[in-house]
Design a protein with these regions (language model features):
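Amphipathic, charge-rich alpha-helical segments that serve as recognition/docking helices
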Residues: 44-46, 52-53, 88-177, 194, ...
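Short, surface-exposed helix-loop/turn micro-motifs enriched in polar/charged residues
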Residues: 28, 69-70, 77-78, 108, ...
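Alpha-helix C-terminal capping/helix-coil junction sites
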Residues: 59-60, 142, 186
């Protein structure tokens, strides 16, 4: 059963920001890019898309308008909390050091909430980004003994942690039911998200193979999402 309710990622982020100076004696320091490690709990996309290219141009032209947030990760190494894509841009631009604020977290769940809150506030996130990150939240809650047994109760707890509704959490997590092929279609825009959500519903998971077979044997005529939609209608008929 779940223990005492933890604060949401957003309230945690706000409190961390407001109290950082008092709690951590926080100040900005230049840390070597080579000493910064990507956070293994970060499941948000690191694709070199238009948003990333814009970030890289900004870093190249104006430097870092906002400090990277890191936490200690061994001797002279630091795990990124906020700023994965900015650090990635710095690496590509050949920068040797970046401005960082060091923060410490009492446990893994607090660190994850800070990571999620920072990204949700600063980035345009896809439904699949949210699905994968919620999956990580579920795993960490389970590891800490805070995840209840019931699916509904799990979704309610995760909703409270992420400031989302329970229905939204369930909808995102359903996307994890899609197989690799359909996930690829949806992420590349070759399948509408409406169809993706429909095929991700538990009652429709068994239809995925039939839909993919239909698509493989029929001509898209320049409209692949339309073909997928027709395949779904055929499989459900």
């Amino acid at each position: 059963m779940a223990g005492k309710k933890s604060p949401s990622i957003f309230s945690t982020l706000q409190k961390t920001t407001e109290n950082a100076s008092a709690v951590n004696g926080e100040f900005v320091r230049q840390l070597r890019v080579s000493d910064l490690e990507d956070n293994p709990m970060n499941r948000f996309s690191m694709a070199e898309d238009d948003e990333f290219l814009s970030t890289m141009r900004s870093v190249e032209q104006d430097g870092f308008l906002e400090d990277i947030v890191v936490t200690p990760d061994g001797e002279n190494t630091w795990r990124i909390i906020s700023g994965h894509r900015r650090v990635m841009a710095a690496r590509k631009l050949g920068k040797t050091a970046v401005p960082c604020k060091v923060r410490r977290y009492p446990d893994k769940l607090s660190e994850l909430r800070a990571l999620m809150g920072a990204n949700v506030h600063r980035r345009s996130l896809s439904p699949f980004d949210m699905a994968r990150q919620l999956e990580t939240l579920r795993e960490v809650l389970s590891e800490s003994g805070q995840l209840p047994d019931g699916t509904k109760e799990q979704a309610e707890l995760m909703a409270a942690q992420s400031d989302l509704s329970r229905a939204t959490v369930e909808r995102y997590l359903d996307l994890l039911n899609l197989d690799e092929t359909m996930t690829g279609w949806a992420e590349r825009g070759e399948m509408t998200m409406t169809d993706a959500y429909e095929m991700a519903r538990r009652k429709n998971v068994h239809l995925q193979a039939a839909v993919e077979e239909y698509v493989a044997h029929n001509n898209a005529n320049g409209d692949f999402p339309g073909l997928v939609h027709r395949a779904i209608a055929w499989a459900k008929a």
